[in-house]
Amino acid sequence: MIFVSCTQDSDWIYLFDGKDVKGLRGYKMEEFPLDSWLIKDGNLKTIPEKKGVDLITEDTFENFELELEWKLQSGGNSGIFYFASEQGDYIWQSAPEMQVLDNIGHQDRLKKVTSAGALYDLVAPSKDMVNPIGNFNKVKIISKNRKVEHWLNGEKIVEYVAGSNHVQELISKSKFSKMPLFFKSYHGHIGFQGDHGEVWYRNIRVRKL
């Protein structure tokens, strides 16, 4: 299944264009966490020696297309969240996550369901599409009428239907079964994990479908 969008370029909302951050703030914060993230060389990156803070969009999304690029340091780990609420203390208590990972140097590589591109701890990617450390990886996430796709470096690697019996069964067998807020909504904030070490993001844009 491939979604084709006919929307214009003007429909894109640039959350980060290499110079400015727009429409992003800290999780459970009113402002952008300047002490935890900085803009450098056209990238939005964490400051690892500072307290990590996750980012979320000011707006919420249900049917959307998200595009961005990421890279990590060796052994790095991060994540891209969607359908997030701010009811819990942490974003991962409510939001499903596309895993961002060094598939060579991080222990989460040992399980496919926690490797790069996975619907974290639920749906494994169909193939390993991660570029070598030091190179950026292109991501696309599409959500349309609860059908969700994860794309990495031009390949669709995850596809599922949010709220389906299959996904609910996977959740029931995972650690998320003990989290009452997890994946209860199919509309929410998009987020970026900032408390797992150094990560670089760039060219972050989203549009509603």
Model-found features: residue ranges?
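Bacterial N-terminal signal peptides
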Residues: M1-I2
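Carbohydrate-interacting regions of secretory-pathway proteins
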Residues: C6-L209
